[in-house]
UniProtKB/Swiss-Prot annotation:
GO terms for cellular component: cytoplasm. GO terms for molecular function: nickel cation binding; unfolded protein binding. Keywords: Chaperone, Cytoplasm, Nickel, Nickel insertion. Residues 171-192 have a biased composition (Basic and acidic residues). Involved in urease metallocenter assembly. Binds nickel. Probably functions as a nickel donor during metallocenter assembly. It comes from Burkholderia pseudomallei (strain K96243). CDD domains: UreE. This is Urease accessory protein UreE. One of its GO terms (biological process) is urea metabolic process. It is found in: Cytoplasm. Its main location: cytoplasm. Pfam families: UreE_C, UreE_N.
Amino acid sequence: MRTIDKRIAPNVRLAATLVARAPALTLAYDARCKSRLAATLDTGEDVALVLPRGTVLRDGDVLVADDGALVRVAAAHEAVLLVRAPDALTLTRAAYHLGNRHTPVEVGAGCLKLEYDPVLADMLTRLGATVERASAPFQPEAGAYGGGHRHGHDATFAEDYALAQQVFDEHHGHSHSHDHDHDHDHDHDHQHGPCCSHGHHHGHR
């Protein structure tokens, strides 16, 4: 089994034809955050990924195997939420609440993308955002990290945490009465970009 142990720095220019010929390693976001991983190239070859601790791979990265061969990284399609809003203030509030939980977010033009999470989908809907489930590559802003930590020093912590706790309790069977319909109709035109994918599943359950 070959070992992939190096990543070529983004500022190193490689011939496009050389990269295009390299086999792809298609990984979801969680897998791209792991520095030690048993993986399978798109060719079917099993490989071992052994990179420096803390390495987060991005779509388009080029790796080097122990035999000198190149491997290109591709972001896999995965379940995500596309978050839009009727105005900039609502979208900003949605981004704030996600950031307060250290939720990895990909920022697009008038849209936020995050990993699928029914609890967060419910919270964002209550904030006034439109939430759409889709299957698409996910590449959050560099430096983002997960965890959902609580920040007691934040001025809006009590209100923010109370809302999140209410949603959490309802999704775990305590009280599941909602005053809104989870299904959303989307009449907007699709534009290609970070927040566009085809074959969407509208609404969330």
